[in-house]
């Protein structure tokens, strides 16, 4: 389902989201889109599990540009365990989980994935 920047920002602040978006910088040999598990929910990210399992760390500084003017969002990428900028020109919300639901889903479906499985997930 296509989602606007403001709606996605609201979802990210409250949930963990699975999204697919158009890459800002195309890469040779990989699809034009990128799939991501991401979250901006600071309660989840700053929790013990967020810091130990997801390796969350605060950014320390804000972006050097106005993300709204660029139609982008900066979010925590759960697989890459780092902050990422996503292009909101074409974003699909595939799934979302509340913080309470997320850890069960993560432990059952995502934690067992190998590095190759995670790359396959991100490129589909």
What are these regions (language model features)?
Residues 89, 101-123:
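C-terminal low-complexity, charged extensions that often adopt amphipathic alpha-helices
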Residues 22-28, 76-81:
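Short, flexible beta-strand-to-coil junctions
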Residues 40-82:
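Acidic, aromatic-enriched beta-alpha/helix-loop junctions
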């Amino acid at each position: 389902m296509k989602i606007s920047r403001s709606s996605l920002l609201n979802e990210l602040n409250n949930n963990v989201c699975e999204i697919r978006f158009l890459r800002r910088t195309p890469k040779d040999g990989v699809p034009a889109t990128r799939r991501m598990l991401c979250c901006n929910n600071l309660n989840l990210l700053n929790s013990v599990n967020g810091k130990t399992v997801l390796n969350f760390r605060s950014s320390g500084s804000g972006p050097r540009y106005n993300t709204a003017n660029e139609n982008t969002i900066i979010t925590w990428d759960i697989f890459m365990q780092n902050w990422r900028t996503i292009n909101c020109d074409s974003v699909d919300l595939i799934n979302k989980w509340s913080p309470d639901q997320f850890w069960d889903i993560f432990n059952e479906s995502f934690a067992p994935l190998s590095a190759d499985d995670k790359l396959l997930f991100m490129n589909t």
